[in-house]
Every structure is written in C-alpha cells, then in structure tokens.
C-alpha cells in the first residue's frame, strides 16, 4: 500500500484522485503535467490528505452514534485534525474510545470516497435545515461546492481526500474541548474532538511516544517540581510569579545576553510602562491593536499600558539630533509588556498577559539593512547553538495591503534575502505574509521532541519612522528618514524558558542551571567545610546550594537528582581532610574525584565555555 498514489501536488495545491476525475481528465490524475506525485506514506503532503479523510471518518462515526449531530468544520491542523460539531447528547473524553472503535468499523468496510460538485443553490438544498453547513457556505465565495461521500455519509468539503476508507488504519483521538462557532465568543459553543493519523503503525507509535514524553516535559509540571515559577488566582490569570530558582535561571540568560549585546554595539535604554494614548494613536496601535491593550486614566488623560517597546525606543531616538555618522543606532531593552489574551488561550509561560521581551530596535540607513540583518543572523546562530536548538527561517514578503513604493519593498526584501544567503541559511518564503509596513524574517526553533516553535522576529519597518517623522542628516546635509529594524531573538523570556525547559526536560545545561552544584555534607562536622566551599563557588558566580537537612545521605542525593542539579558533591571525612572532592557529574554521567583547586578552576572554565 505504501507505493499507492493518492494525490498530486501542483501549483501549491493538493489535487486528489476524485478531484482529477471531476476536472474531466480522461486518464485521471496521470494526465496532469508538471506535478509532484503524493504517495501513501508519512510525508507531510500525504499526511494532510490522510488526516483530512480521518476527520471525515470521525464525523461519519459521530453521525452514526449521535444521529442528531451537525457539523461545522473539520480541518487539518499542525497537531493533526479536529472536527467541530454539536449534539444534544453529552459527550466527554470517556466517550473517545467508543467513537474511535466506530471509526475502525467504518474503515474496515473499505468505503469508496467519491466527490461531486454542486452549485450554491444545490448545496443549500442538499444541506437544508443544517444551519452549521449554511454558516460554512456563507463564508465561501463562488458557485462551486465540493461534496465528498463515503457510504451514507456526505460532507461539504473542498478536499483533498483519500480514495477509500481502507487506508485509514493508524489513528488516535487525542482530546475533547469546547470551541465557539467560528471562534467568536458571541456565538454558541460547539464540541471539538482532536485526533491524529498516520500512514504507518510506526508513525503513530512514534507520535504517541512523543506525546507521553511531552507530558513528562511539560514546563508547567517542571515549573512546580523544580520551583521555577507559579501562578496565583488572587493575582490573576496569565501573570507569572518567578520563584528564586526560576529567577536565577532567567537572570543568567539576561546577563549573558546583555554582555553579548554590549560587545555588539547595542546601548541599553528603558521606556515607561504606560504612555499617553496620543502616542498610540500616532503609532497606529490605538486603531489596529486596541483590543489587545490595557488602558487607564490619569488626571483625565487616557494612557495605554505598552503592548510593545517600539514607541519608547522611538522617543529615545527623538531625544537628540542624529547624522549619518551616528548610524546605525542599536537600542535594547528587556521590556515588560502587557497584552490582553483571552483566558482560553493562556498556557503556562507560553501564553501570558505580562511578559518580558529581549527587544531591540536598530535605526539605520537603507543601505545598512543587509549588514545589520546579517549581524542579527550571526547573533541568532550563536544563541541557538549555545542552547542546542536547530532552527529555520521564514521570509515573509509584501502583502496585498501595504504602504510604500514597490522599489523600496523590493530593495528591503532583497537585503533580507542577501543576508540569509550570506549565512548560507535555507529559508522558506511566505508570499504576502509580511506586515503592511515591511518584510520580516521569522525564527522557528526545533526542540528535542522535533516540535517547531515560533520565537524571534527580524522586522524591517518603513511605517513608524514615517508616522513619527524620524530623520537624520545625510552626507549631503539633507534630512533623510531612517529605517527601523525590530529585533527579538528569544521572543520573550517567558516563552523561551518554557521551550527551554521542555527541550531539556528540566536538565538545564550547567551554564544556566538554576542550581549548578549541590553540596551534601554527610554530617554536622562536615558542614563548615561545605559553607566554605559554597562561598568559594559563589565568588565564581556559581549557583550553589547546601543540602543540610537532617535526612539520610541517600535521601539528600535523591533530592538533588530530582532537582536535576548538574553536579552533586558529597562531603565526608576524606573530602574535608584531603580536599579531594567526590563529584557526581550529570552531564558526563560519571563519578570522579578531583582536587579542590582543580575543581574550582574547572567550574570557572565551564562558565566561560558559552558566549553569544
């Protein structure tokens, strides 16, 4: 079955076998020229077809089990597929095995999946009395509506789909949730069931293993177990509390970045947390981003709590006159921002209402865009390398609605492409995916579980400099508008630390571990030596803890291991008398002895191994 053709890819579109027949191709799909064949396997294009058909298999099974069920949409998404529907029956996650069993029954029937195309009038008549399908049709322009059938079940859909349910053997329903119709909170709540599907048994097995591993590595779970952060309902949702260990981890990353930023010619700046609404009106945030902002009134004047740091940095730029000799100007700030996120999307540190960006804005001439972006790419590579992340870049180009001259856009986009080319970085292009004011590069990192995360962005901005009338004096002594480059590599410390926690499963590398060394005195008489060693390590900027509770040695060692501390030193008579230390090294997965002076020298060296 693995060699069977299920569709082709042509002009950035998947065309399935049934669609080829509907197109009137006498030889079916083989008559299509200039296409990439899609075979039944676990490749991304094949999985899109497989998962789309599995969504229909889910809907067919739901209809059989709950005859009053009505269906909205069932798309393929990054984590598999889902279907939104409603029924008078009460459904919980306990019902998923029953639904899954019914899906397997239909799959074994080897039902042919066929397609027909209806006019709008025909489609409205076909789904008469189905308000959810009518809602779907109201969002579709044109007069052609695809309808796929398998057995007695049919559904409005543009495809693509498999030719038969016999292909669907390796799937799993993963969770049940609620979802507002069309994502609008003013509409009724529907039921959403998620699932995953693969061509092969191995693909499903590997995925389910990753899901279980992801549960173990969930940063919310690790945050509690390792004492990194917490949330408190009395404070409010989406507002994290950084506990001492988490704050130590975060500060270490901040300090490493600050050192690197200063060496790279960035200047630290700091803007206020609240700014008059007048300035948000100039920037365009008031008209285009107001629903995501928080506002307050002071002395009858409206203020907006900043959702971004760019306006503050613009005002820093405007605080002095500038000539071409001053450029580029690189300002950075660990800026605390607030954004109104709906409670349903809040998720640990990954999605919060208050967060801190590793934000920087570069003011430069148009000719300096490429060199500045190139330097940012170099910086990005060093950071990702230090944290053992692989990453990819995506270049987003001019959208249909945008400002600025075509030549300016072409030049700016070309500068980004040349910078990527200079660093030999393979990148994807998101045509039309840029902001209305300039092209951008998105940084997407891949973690240990092969999940991709959107983190940093490099954004060329030709809009805000114009709105705020920014200028510098050029070589001809004329006023010229600078380009503004928005740049955040981590994205936010909260999000990055969440991803970092899951990437390492809490086993942070030595240079950022919230506790790097645990000292375990065997009994009271070894405590003085432990405190002396602790002070020596603290002077070397090492995060160290003495585990001196009245517990057994084994219990203290297990505690240190549970806390995922990279180095554990057990201190007894021999260590105190000889000053030769017994070290349990997590990274080396070894136990060894080392003289005290040599050990102190080693940890100093380890702290110097990583730089950005």
UniProtKB/Swiss-Prot annotation:
Its main location: cytoplasm. This is Threonine--tRNA ligase. It catalyses: tRNA(Thr) + L-threonine + ATP = L-threonyl-tRNA(Thr) + AMP + diphosphate + H(+). Catalyzes the attachment of threonine to tRNA(Thr) in a two-step reaction: L-threonine is first activated by ATP to form Thr-AMP and then transferred to the acceptor end of tRNA(Thr). Also edits incorrectly charged L-seryl-tRNA(Thr). Its cofactor is Zn(2+). Binds 1 zinc ion per subunit. Keywords: Aminoacyl-tRNA synthetase, ATP-binding, Cytoplasm, Ligase, Metal-binding, Nucleotide-binding, Protein biosynthesis, RNA-binding, tRNA-binding, Zinc. Belongs to the class-II aminoacyl-tRNA synthetase family. The gene is thrS. Its EC number is 6.1.1.3. It comes from Helicobacter pylori (strain G27).
């Amino acid at each position: 079955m693995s060699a069977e053709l299920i569709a082709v890819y042509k002009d950035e579109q998947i065309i399935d076998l049934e669609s080829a027949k509907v197109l009137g191709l006498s030889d079916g799909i083989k008559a299509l020229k200039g296409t990439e064949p899609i075979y039944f396997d676990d490749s991304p294009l094949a999985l899109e077809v497989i998962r789309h058909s599995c969504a229909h298999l889910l809907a067919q099974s739901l209809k059989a089990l709950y005859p009053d069920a009505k269906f909205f949409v069932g798309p393929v998404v990054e984590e598999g597929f889902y279907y939104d529907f409603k029924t008078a029956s009460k459904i919980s996650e306990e019902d998923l095995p029953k639904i899954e069993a019914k899906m397997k029954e239909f799959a074994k029937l080897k039902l042919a999946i066929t397609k027909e195309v209806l006019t709008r009038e025909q489609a409205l008549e076909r789904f008469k009395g189905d308000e959810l399908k009518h809602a779907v049709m109201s969002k579709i322009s044109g007069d052609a509506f695809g309808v796929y059938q398998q057995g007695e079940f049919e559904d409005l859909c543009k495809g693509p789909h498999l030719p038969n349910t016999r292909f669907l053997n390796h799937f799993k329903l993963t969770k049940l949730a609620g979802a507002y119709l069309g994502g609008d909170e003013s509409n009724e709540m529907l039921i959403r069931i998620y699932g995953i599907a693969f061509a092969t048994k191995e693909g499903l097995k590997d995925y389910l293993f990753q899901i279980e591993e992801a549960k173990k590595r969930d940063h919310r779970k690790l945050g509690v177990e390792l004492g990194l952060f917490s949330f408190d309902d009395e404070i409010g949702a989406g507002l994290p509390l950084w506990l001492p260990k988490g704050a130590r981890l975060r500060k270490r990353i901040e300090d490493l970045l600050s050192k690197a930023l200063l060496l790279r010619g960035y200047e630290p700046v700091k803007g206020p947390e609240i700014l008059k609404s007048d300035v948000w009106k100039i920037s365009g945030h008031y008209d285009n981003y107001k629903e995501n902002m928080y506002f307050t009134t002071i002395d009858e004047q409206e203020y907006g709590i900043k959702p971004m740091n760019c306006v503050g940095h613009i005002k820093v730029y405007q605080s002095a006159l500038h000539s071409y000799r001053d450029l580029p100007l690189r300002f950075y700030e660990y800026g605390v921002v607030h954004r109104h996120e709906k409670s349903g999307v809040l998720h640990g540190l990954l999605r919060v209402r208050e967060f801190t960006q590793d934000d920087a804005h570069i003011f430069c001439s148009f000719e300096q865009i490429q060199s500045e972006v190139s330097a940012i790419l170099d910086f990005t590579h060093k950071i990702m390398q230090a944290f053992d992340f692989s990453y990819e870049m995506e270049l987003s180009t001019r959208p249909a609605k945008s400002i600025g001259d075509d030549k300016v856009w072409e030049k700016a986009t070309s500068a980004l492409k040349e910078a990527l080319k200079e660093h030999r970085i393979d990148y994807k292009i998101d045509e039309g995916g840029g902001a209305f004011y300039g092209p951008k590069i998105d940084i997407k990192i891949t973690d240990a579980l092969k999940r991709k995360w959107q983190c940093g962005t490099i954004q060329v901005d030709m809009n805000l400099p114009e709105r705020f009338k920014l200028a510098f004096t050029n070589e001809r002594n004329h006023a010229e508008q600078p380009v503004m480059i928005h740049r955040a590599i981590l994205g936010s410390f909260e999000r990055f630390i969440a991803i970092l926690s899951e990437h390492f499963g809490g086993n942070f590398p030595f240079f950022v571990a919230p506790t790097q060394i645990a000292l375990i005195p065997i009994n009271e008489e070894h405590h003085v030596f432990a405190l002396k060693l602790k002070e020596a390590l603290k002077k070397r900027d090492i995060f160290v803890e003495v585990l001196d509770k009245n517990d057994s040695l084994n219990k203290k060692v297990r505690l240190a291991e549970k806390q995922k501390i990279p180095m554990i030193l057990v201190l007894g008579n021999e260590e105190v008398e000889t000053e030769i230390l017994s070290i349990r090294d997590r990274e080396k997965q070894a136990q060894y002895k080392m003289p005290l002076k040599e050990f102190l020298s080693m940890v100093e060296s380890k702290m110097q191994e990583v730089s950005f």
